[in-house]
Every structure is written in C-alpha cells, then in structure tokens.
Amino acid sequence: EPADPAARVVRTVLGDRAGREWLQAPWSGVPAALGSSTTADWPKQWNRWRERALEADPSRDLARVERAGGGFVMRSDPRWPAQLECLGEDEPLGLWFLGSLPESPACSGYVSIVGARASTSAGGRCARNMAYQLARAGYGVVSGGAIGIDIEAHRGAMAGDGATVCVLAGGVLNPYPACHTEDFRQMVAGRGVLIS
C-alpha cells in the first residue's frame, strides 16, 4: 500500500519480513521501534491489515506467476520502469508481470491511450488506427484491458508489431474482462506484457 503512510513506516522501520511477521503473529503489542516513529494508532492499523497479512504467501504467489511465464519486479530490478519514479510516495512497491518485461525500452517511448468503455465504433477505429501508427513509428502503447478504447489501442499496437503494456487491476493471473482472454494471450505471446 504505497499511499498508506503507516504502512510505509512499517516497511521502513521494521522491513518487509519483520513487518509481515508482526502482522501474522497474535497481537503482542506494538514493536518498540514503531512506538516512537509516528502517531499512528497501531492497534487499529494492525487489525485493519491482519486479515490480508494472514492470507499473504508471497513465495506461493511468485511461484504461480513464474510457472505462467511471469514474475515480480521491484525498483532495484533493471527492468523497473523508471517513469514510475515521478509518482513519489505513490510509486508502486513492485509490479507483477506476465510476458516480456525488457531491461531497456523496446521502443522509442510509450504513449497511453485510454478512453470510454462504451465507445462508438468510430472511436474504437480511431484508437486502433492511432495505436497502429504509433507502433509503426516505434512507440509502445500503454492502456488498461477494458472493453472499448483500451482494448482497441492494444489491438492496434499488436497489428503494427509494436510493444504493448496492459495494466490490470485484478492481477496478471486473473485478467479481466474474460471476453479479452485471447487478446491478453496474444499480448503475452508477442511484444506485450500484462502488469498489475
């Protein structure tokens, strides 16, 4: 939770492993290191995070994604998209990916094309044609995976043999919507990547 200041304190002061162990163990109070670090209501935070912490199994999740042909990257990885640094404290802590995540940009740059889900056929054609032309000019396309403009942008980029990055909210192993399963498969098989 990069935008959660209390979670940032736990990661900074305790570290990822010790923070997770604190959340997964029965309540035993606030670790001394956290006591003086902020005015957070630690018992309340602990209760808020605990259920998710008990379900978390990063090793299991990573193994599942790796078996599917993906992985997990953090800022220290050379494949980390440096453009995310502009988000400051809201920069993601890591990205799950499925497909090819190159160490250096596979193109001249990236352009985001997003729009309405309930787009007109003319709007869909426009997004597809724009993405196609950008791909032919050496640019990659970034969009979500939604019905409408988003998926048409990916289709155009793939038709132009371009790189495409599909940002998914529900995880790379649960791409949504299901009606785009074949598009997601083509992205991963080509020059595309699903990230979450």
Regions found by a protein language model. Name each.
Residues E1-R79:
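Short, small/acidic-rich helices and loops at N termini and domain boundaries
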Residues A68-S196:
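Glycine-biased, small-residue-rich flexible motifs in mid-sequence functional cores and linkers
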